[in-house]
Design a protein with these regions (language model features):
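Glycine-/charge-enriched secondary-structure boundary and capping motifs
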Residues: 2-8, 25, 118, 122-136, ...
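Acidic, glycine-rich loop-and-beta core segments that form the ion-binding/anion-interacting portion
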Residues: 177-218, 222
Length: 345
């Protein structure tokens, strides 16, 4: 028997090195002067002193997230340049809920067989998203795992770190009945509900990713691949105008029904007014194809609202004014006395 090597077992070290060569310039372009290490280090060094000088009592906020089975849509289309945007946006939005400014990002890309060009495409999306919001992509990991992942599939995970002034942490504790619920529009499914959406379109509907449906402007695949909106600029535009946001909810898995209660204090519920914002065509199409009940749609998908602000009724106009030209703002409901839950009316 001749000599064997690692590559014959399914792991190609040279491919990993090639991937690093392809992404290194893009990754470095996200670095600020706070980043003290380059690619290839065992860890990432980030100088906190210049950051901490801007805070009286800094609190670090971290979150970890993935993009779920949206990667399957990317694989079917052979288009991987937006799922990196999804990864950064999903993680960043989760810490924005507390008023934290995202600073650094780490990524993990796993697959059955490492293809450097695909890794480059995925990371290019992260780089784009990081540069748009001032986040440094300080490190990452690629894992080639034969026999673990199906051929051609990828798993993406991102870890984000941010900072917030302790006195300015948005906790939701000051929310009270009479406050107004504002919705910021999504542009699609974002990164949640893809197993359900794939079942509806591909199993029940019998569609292919390249098929066109009259009510959708793009093909099924491109509609589903629409990148997750990053709300960093939205949140800080409002906060920098010294408008008091009492609570923020990132509308992810569980939709409005499951996510808004996560930021409500005891004794407060929310009534959502159906029809108070435009539901995107993709959701209406899925509901029709799958004959899905309304409540299930609102629990599985964001239904066209990607982030929710809860504010005093007197601040509604100020929020709309601050975000004019950046996003539409819809008054979608109100805070009421009662159980910590969301009701649709």
């Amino acid at each position: 028997m001749g000599n064997i090597d690692y590559k014959s077992a399914g792991v190609d070290i040279d491919a990993g090195n090639e991937a690093i060569d392809l992404i290194k310039d893009g990754v470095k372009s996200t670095f600020t002067s706070n980043v003290l290490t380059g690619l290839g280090s065992f860890g990432s060094l980030y100088d906190l002193k210049p950051i901490l000088e801007k805070y009286d009592h800094p609190v670090m906020v971290q979150s970890i997230d993935g993009v779920g089975t949206k990667t399957i849509i990317a694989r079917k289309l052979g288009k991987f340049d937006t799922i990196g945007i999804d990864l950064l946006s999903a993680a960043a939005n989760d810490i924005l809920v507390m008023g934290a400014r995202p600073l650094t990002f780490l990524d993990y890309i796993a697959n059955d067989k490492l293809k450097p060009k695909i890794v480059e495409e995925i990371v290019s999306g992260m780089v784009k998203a990081c540069k748009e919001t001032g986040v440094s992509l300080v490190g990452g990991e690629t894992a080639e795992m034969p026999d673990t992942y199906l051929p051609g599939e990828h798993d993406l995970v991102g870890i984000i770190t941010g900072m917030v002034e302790k006195e300015k942490i948005i906790t939701g504790k000051s929310i009270k009945p009479g406050n107004v619920v504002l919705g910021l529009p999504s542009n699609g499914l974002h990164t949640n509900g893809y197993s359900f959406a794939r079942k509806i379109f591909f199993e029940i509907g019998g569609y292919d990713v390249n098929d066109m449906i009259p009510k959708l402007e793009k093909s099924v695949g491109l509609t589903l691949l629409e990148p997750h909106i990053n709300y960093t600029n939205h949140v800080f535009t409002v906060l920098n105008n010294e408008i008091d946001i009492k609570g923020i909810a990132h509308i992810t898995g569980g939709g409005l029904i499951e996510n808004i209660p996560r930021v409500l204090p005891d004794g407060c519920g929310v009534k959502i007014q159906k029809g108070s914002w435009p539901i995107l065509p993709v959701f209406n199409v899925m509901q029709s194809i799958g004959d899905v009940g309304e409540n299930e749609m609102f629990r599985a998908f964001n239904m066209g609202v990607g982030m929710v602000f809860i504010v005093d009724s007197n601040d509604v106009g100020f929020v709309k004014g601050a975000l004019k030209g950046l996003a539409e703002v819809y008054k979608i409901g109100s805070v009421v006395d009662g159980e910590k839950r969301v009701t649709l009316k």
